[in-house]
Amino acid sequence: MLDYTLIKRKLALSEEELQKLTPYRNMTLEQAAGDFLTQAAVERVLEKVITRGIDINRHIIGAIGTHLRAPRKNRETFLHLAELALYPREFAEKIAPSAGFRNALVHDYNNLDEATRNTKIGDVIKMYTDYAKYILDFLDQHRAADLLKAAQDRTG
């Protein structure tokens, strides 16, 4: 069963933290690395936001995606949500690599490729803002379906 409160809380925390990154939206990750405190703050916020996204994905897959094989890699969780029609496949392919970025942050920042280093912080903010909208739309639709089913069950 979906835990709407848990998912919405994680999305709200991420939104709050992403808003704090807006002063850096025109910087690339490479530029943020030029200042230790900026780099540390940006990395930590992005790591937390991406981790919450992966947690949300796994929760949704566990609740409604029982017909899918369990994702072995974090990036697969984003692709599975496209299979469950939460968002378009193109969006899944765009956001899925962020799981690898999160792993690079956690394990070894030096392994980031040039394209990732040149990613604008604003692009990541937009991607996860869009992600939150897709998830919230899904939750609204799913809750409506749950309420309809409950009403039908009561009327027999």
Residue ranges and their predicted role:
Residues M1-G156:
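Solvent-exposed interaction patches of small proteins and small membrane subunits
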